């Protein structure tokens, strides 16, 4: 009550903002006469003038009045449309980090041209985000003449574009795209193995259309790129046959002891290691199998992957036991939880271990599907330097927009007053009674030729109501979300006299329902229409328009209340555009989901008794308020859920940003040798610390353990014990320095053999490959941690704090492992010529290429796109030039597609 009194005296925050912006509109209007006098060339020259002023230090805000006046005048000349004052207000709101709530039909597409032009002047790129491909293409083509007249480039980015076309689209001043494609391209960029393979520039300014749909409804939709692991079924099966020929040895070889076995086991850490004797035996068998060439070793750069498979098979046979660690059920290997003894269906061991066990048990070897990159819309759009959005319904979620995204919501007044008649809800006892009342309402509307749009909460309810209308002999259209272009066409015609259209609540957003039908669409269907044809179509439309206006405009019927008031408001907002007449009513029943969920059985029974006759309707403003109150509670609950989940996502998001920043540094930097030197020192110091603690006396040293660790991890055989016996002045620091110096010298000797340029490229390749592999495993581990962390609450611990703490430990451990793996590979690599290291590089590139081709996007909104493809055999029989387009239809050059596969076959 007090807040209402204060608002009535001082005005709301929204009112004060609008008052301030109206003063700026007056300034823009004052410029209009002068801009009308400019020639086309003078008007077009304004763009270059504004860019120069920005380069000279002017701010965007200082250019706003003139820039908006320029766009308005250009729009009048090019498109025949002049921006209303309220559209100028909307444009100013969208220039900064705000959301503009603009009612349906108020011209959001035209309003968007103002902030897009202003922000594009920076040269950093503007992204206009839509909910589907059709709207992205439509809006781009609608506004393209205006932007190109003003000297700005426009492009569309949708799924399926060839890489070069997509890359050019992101270079445009203004790029129209869908939210999902922007997110996937961001992830693809952070999987690229060369900087020239990336698509996006720095994320500068995004203008999100239907912002509530993307940033609220789909906020938790994860964009996931997953890649099947390399299909190595035959290799797993071949190597599985080697293991029975190997003999276990009790302990590892040392200077004093050389065993007769082929491998040793570390039962504590469940690891296996080949002895020198075992290495030679395995290499011999692999050579006989044709998997290796004569004279090659398993540490040859091109054969490291084989060694990985051998160790996986050893562990599978010697360290993992049937009915103890796993069971075989229905032809699948199912892991047994070591703590609970329960099976964990769907879980798989990584690093090829699961496939090795499948080979051991002679069951089908499944490919590994692994998440290689993921991000939520919440976290993706928060990466933009400037973010703005527009929608017809945002005010109910204003608090969430502010809390999560830091965006203020400004309600923009309509150009003409809304005269739609929003009638009170009608409540019925059962769904059949409700449907009967809806059909009666539709029949009455059809009798006076009033168009009707019926909104349903689900496809199932749409089909149910459609069947009832068919029984009643009522012709109608049903919308589904499968074909966006046709959907928009049907919605555009939904305003024709007597038209009946059933749609799910969200269907057709972004397309206006024009009373009388869409005359522009009729003209567009004609090839080279004459003036007479155009005038005839307009005249026929005017007659239909008058009929619909007389009938009361578009009538909206809601078949039930949605959990969110915003969705209901969106449905209502389809009617009464730009001062047109219209009406709306919601029909409810006690069988509706909202009533069943939020009213207990006692209250429902009481309400059922209140209905005395079949078909009787209960109408009450109090009932409408009660339902609105229930909806507000649901919205608050959903917001708390999204906010809670975001707090968990933020932890992974910070780690993702750190990894991607490091990855981009690797791609941008030609020489990372200084980084490798630093990492080498860190890794060797950490290994030495395990056996020779800092500031310790010699009696505390485990010299034999250090010698073995250096040999196992880095392939270095150093006589440390002999040094200590011969040199009395050798202490901890000097010993540490000597070991690192020898490692560095050995590495530099390899570099001299192959050349520094080749070694630099190889270092980057090893670093990127290990970073990507460990990041994939880390994502899986984080997912497992997230799923079980809530159980910490039973131990009186805060799950969020525990998650932050453990995920940070996992992240630092991953970084330590990354350093160790990189230095281990670089230290153990055996090179005798430049050709060998280049072959290893080519294998890395081939693996990266194969991965990028195998990545699949998993998005619950994405539609399956089927295309005919040529078989490998057909491709092999074609005479194709290396630089010709690949005939598979990928859009890539043959050498980068199936030509690449043939090369590495």
UniProtKB/Swiss-Prot annotation:
Cofactor(s) needed: Zn(2+)
Protein localization: Cell inner membrane; Cytoplasm
Biased composition (Polar residues): 863-874
Amino acid composition bias (Basic residues), ranges on this chain: 892-905
Listed SUPFAM superfamilies: Helical scaffold and wing domains of SecA, P-loop containing nucleoside triphosphate hydrolases, Pre-protein crosslinking domain of SecA
Pfam family, one: SecA_DEAD
Keyword Repeat among UniProt keywords: no
Enzyme superclass (EC): translocase
BP term (GO), one: protein targeting
Membrane topology type: Peripheral membrane protein
Catalytic reaction list: ATP + H2O + cellular proteinSide 1 = ADP + phosphate + cellular proteinSide 2
Region of interest: Disordered: 840-905
Keyword tags: ATP-binding, Cell inner membrane, Cell membrane, Cytoplasm, Membrane, Metal-binding, Nucleotide-binding, Protein transport, Translocase, Translocation, Transport, Zinc
Residues the record lists as binding Zn(2+): 886, 888, 897-898
Function: Part of the Sec protein translocase complex. Interacts with the SecYEG preprotein conducting channel. Has a central role in coupling the hydrolysis of ATP to the transfer of proteins into and across the cell membrane, serving both as a receptor for the preprotein-SecB complex and as an ATP-driven molecular motor driving the stepwise translocation of polypeptide chains across the membrane.
Family annotation (HAMAP family): SecA
Family named by the database record: Belongs to the SecA family.
Descriptive protein name: Protein translocase subunit SecA
Taxonomic source organism: Actinobacillus pleuropneumoniae serotype 5b (strain L20)
Lineage: Bacteria, Pseudomonadati, Pseudomonadota, Gammaproteobacteria, Pasteurellales
């Amino acid at each position: 009550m007090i807040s209402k009194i204060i608002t009535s005296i001082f005005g709301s925050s929204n009112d004060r903002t609008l008052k301030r912006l109206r003063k700026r509109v007056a300034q823009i209007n004052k410029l209009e006469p002068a801009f009308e006098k400019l020639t086309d060339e003078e008007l077009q020259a304004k763009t270059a003038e504004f860019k120069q002023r920005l380069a000279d230090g002017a701010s965007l805000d200082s250019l706003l009045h003139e820039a908006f006046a320029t766009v308005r005048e250009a729009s009048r000349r090019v498109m025949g449309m002049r921006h209303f004052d309220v559209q100028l207000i909307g444009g100013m709101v969208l220039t900064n980090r705000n959301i503009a709530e603009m009612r349906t039909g108020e011209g959001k597409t035209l309003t968007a041209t103002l902030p897009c032009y202003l922000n594009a002047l920076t040269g950093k790129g503007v992204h206009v985000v839509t909910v589907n491909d059709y709207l992205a293409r439509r809006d781009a083509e609608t506004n393209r003449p205006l932007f190109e007249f003003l000297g700005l480039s426009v492009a569309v980015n949708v799924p399926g574009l060839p890489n070069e076309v997509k890359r050019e689209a992101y270079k445009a001043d203004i790029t129209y795209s869908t939210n999902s494609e922007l997110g996937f391209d961001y992830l693809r960029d952070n999987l690229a193995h060369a900087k020239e393979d990336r698509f996006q520039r720095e994320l500068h300014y995004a203008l999100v259309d239907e912002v509530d749909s993307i940033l609220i409804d789909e906020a938790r939709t994860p964009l996931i790129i997953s890649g099947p692991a390399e299909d190595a079924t035959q290799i797993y099966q071949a190597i599985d046959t080697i293991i029975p020929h190997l003999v276990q040895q009790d302990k590892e070889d040392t200077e004093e002891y050389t065993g007769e076995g082929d491998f040793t086991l570390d039962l504590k850490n469940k690891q296996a290691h080949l002895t020198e004797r075992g290495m030679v035996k395995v290499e011999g068998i692999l050579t006989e199998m044709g998997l290796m060439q004569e004279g090659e070793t398993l540490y040859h750069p091109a054969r490291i992957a084989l060694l990985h498979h051998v160790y996986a098979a050893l562990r599978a046979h010697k360290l993992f036991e049937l009915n103890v660690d796993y069971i075989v059920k229905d032809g699948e290997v199912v892991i047994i939880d070591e703590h609970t003894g329960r099976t964990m269906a769907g879980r798989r061991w990584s690093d090829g271990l699961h496939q090795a066990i499948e080979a051991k048990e002679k069951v089908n070897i499944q490919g590994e599907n692994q998440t290689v990159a993921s991000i939520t819309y919440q976290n993706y759009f928060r990466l933009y330097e400037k973010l703005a959005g527009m929608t017809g319904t945002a005010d109910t979620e204003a608090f969430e927009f502010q809390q999560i995204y830091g965006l203020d919501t400004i309600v923009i007044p309509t150009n003409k007053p809304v005269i739609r008649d929003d009638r009170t809800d009608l409540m019925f006892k059962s769904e059949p009674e409700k449907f009967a009342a809806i059909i009666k309402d539709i029949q009455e509307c059809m009798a006076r030729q009033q168009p009707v749009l019926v909104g349903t909460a689900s496809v199932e309810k749409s089909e149910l109501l459609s069947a009832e209308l068919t029984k009643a002999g009522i012709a109608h259209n049903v919308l589904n979300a499968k074909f966006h272009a046709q959907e928009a066409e049907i919605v555009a015609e939904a305003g024709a006299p007597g038209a009946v259209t059933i749609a799910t609540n969200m269907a057709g957003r972004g397309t206006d329902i024009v009373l009388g039908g869409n005359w522009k669409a009729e003209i567009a269907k004609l090839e080279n229409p004459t003036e007479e044809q155009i005038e005839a179509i307009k005249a026929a439309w005017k007659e239909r328009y008058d009929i619909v206006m007389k009938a009361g405009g578009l009538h909206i019927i809601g078949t039930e209340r949605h959990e969110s008031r915003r969705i209901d408001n969106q449905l209502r907002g389809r009617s009464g555009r730009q001062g047109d007449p219209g009406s709306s009513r919601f029909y409810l029943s006690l069988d509706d989901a909202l009533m069943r969920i939020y009213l207990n059985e006692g209250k429902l029974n009481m309400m059922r008794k209140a209905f005395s006759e079949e078909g009787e309707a209960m109408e009450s403003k109090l009932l409408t308020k009660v339902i609105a109150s229930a909806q507000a509670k649901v919205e608050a609950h959903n917001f708390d859920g999204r906010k809670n989940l975001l707090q968990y996502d933020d932890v992974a998001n910070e780690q993702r940003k750190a990894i991607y920043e490091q990855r981009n540094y690797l791609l941008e930097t030609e020489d990372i040798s200084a980084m490798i030197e630093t990492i080498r020192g860190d890794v060797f110091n950490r290994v030495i610390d395990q056996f020779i603690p800092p500031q310790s006396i010699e009696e505390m040293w485990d010299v034999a353990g250090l010698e073995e660790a250096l040999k196992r991890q880095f392939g270095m055989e150093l006589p440390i014990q002999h040094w200590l016996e011969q040199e009395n002045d050798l202490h901890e620091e000097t010993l540490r320095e000597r070991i690192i110096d020898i490692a560095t010298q050995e590495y530099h000797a390899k570099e001299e053999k192959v050349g520094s340029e080749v070694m630099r490229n190889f270092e980057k390749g090893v670093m990127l490959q290990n970073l990507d592999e460990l990041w994939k495993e880390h994502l899986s581990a984080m997912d497992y941690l997230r799923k079980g962390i809530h159980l910490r609450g039973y131990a009186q611990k805060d799950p969020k704090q525990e998650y932050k703490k453990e995920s940070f430990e996992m992240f630092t451990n991953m970084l330590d492992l990354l350093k160790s793996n990189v230095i281990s590979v670089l230290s153990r690599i055996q090179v005798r010529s430049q050709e060998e290291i280049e072959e290893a590089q080519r294998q890395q590139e081939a693996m990266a290429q194969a991965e990028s081709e195998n990545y699949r996007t998993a998005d619950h909104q994405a539609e399956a796109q089927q295309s005919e493809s040529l078989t490998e055999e057909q491709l092999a029989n074609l005479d194709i030039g290396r630089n010709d387009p690949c005939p598979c239809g990928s859009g890539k050059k043959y050498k980068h597609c199936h030509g690449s596969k043939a090369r590495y076959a």
